[in-house]
Amino acid sequence: MIGKLKGTIDEIGEDHVVLDVHGVGYVAHCSARTLGKLGSAGEAAVLFIETYVREDQLKLFGFLSALEREWFRLLQSVQGVGSKVALAVLSTLTPGELANAIALQDKTSISRAPGVGPKVAVRIVTELKNKAPAFSGEMAPSIGLKQELGEGVAAAPVADAVSALTNLGYSRDQAANAVAAALKNGGEGGDSAKLIRLGLKELSR
């Protein structure tokens, strides 16, 4: 089983990279986000690898971080999500943005990924809502927001507020943190307009 490869980029294709490791070229399929962050041919690169072995095929998937690889695995635990859809989601959202979307039950953000329809997006946010917080690191903002939501806070206004703040140029982590603070400081039970207003107040501090 291959877990990690360190070598020199030989070529970058539309959905894969060929990594030369001591004269052997390994083809690793990657998300568009990962491919965009790799260097050019001739430059060094390190990829965390997920190996798929089938009867007539051995396929490698490459990731810039172990965290991205874990999300790739987790996404495929959802019914109807295979490697192609998982890579499409990771091409559209960072691990942190994906965690935020799941915490907020924000199926709209996930359905932006190519090949991900509304039904699959709903399954992703529903089936992973109790699994995503098990991860840490850059997903901490979404976990904090999920804790602020609790059981009695409607997710739709919160998702709308986070979306509106990101449309204003803030990152999803900044928006999630601001909305979490807004909920904590009196915004619980409010509509999206109130949460946006309170969120902007938090961001201006």
Curated annotation (Swiss-Prot):
Q: Could you tell me which residues belong to the region Domain I?
A: 1-64
Q: Which GO terms describe its molecular function?
A: ATP binding; four-way junction DNA binding; four-way junction helicase activity
Where, subcellularly, is it found?
Cytoplasm
Provide the residue span(s) of the region labelled Flexible linker. Answer: 144-153
SUPFAM superfamilies the record matches:
DNA helicase RuvA subunit, C-terminal domain (SSF46929), Nucleic acid-binding proteins (SSF50249), RuvA domain 2-like (SSF47781)
A Pfam cross-reference name: RuvA_N
Q: Name one GO cellular component term.
A: Holliday junction resolvase complex
Q: Which domain of life is it from?
A: Bacteria
Q: Some GO term, biological process aspect, for this entry: which one? A: DNA recombination
User: Keyword annotations for this protein?
Assistant: Cytoplasm, DNA damage, DNA recombination, DNA repair, DNA-binding
Task: Cite the residue spans of the region called Domain III.
Answer: 153-205
Q: Which family does it belong to?
A: Belongs to the RuvA family.
Which function does this protein serve? The RuvA-RuvB-RuvC complex processes Holliday junction (HJ) DNA during genetic recombination and DNA repair, while the RuvA-RuvB complex plays an important role in the rescue of blocked DNA replication forks via replication fork reversal (RFR). RuvA specifically binds to HJ cruciform DNA, conferring on it an open structure. The RuvB hexamer acts as an ATP-dependent pump, pulling dsDNA into and through the RuvAB complex. HJ branch migration allows RuvC to scan DNA until it finds its consensus sequence, where it cleaves and resolves the cruciform DNA.
NCBIfam families in the record, alphabetically? ruvA
Tell me the protein's name: Holliday junction branch migration complex subunit RuvA
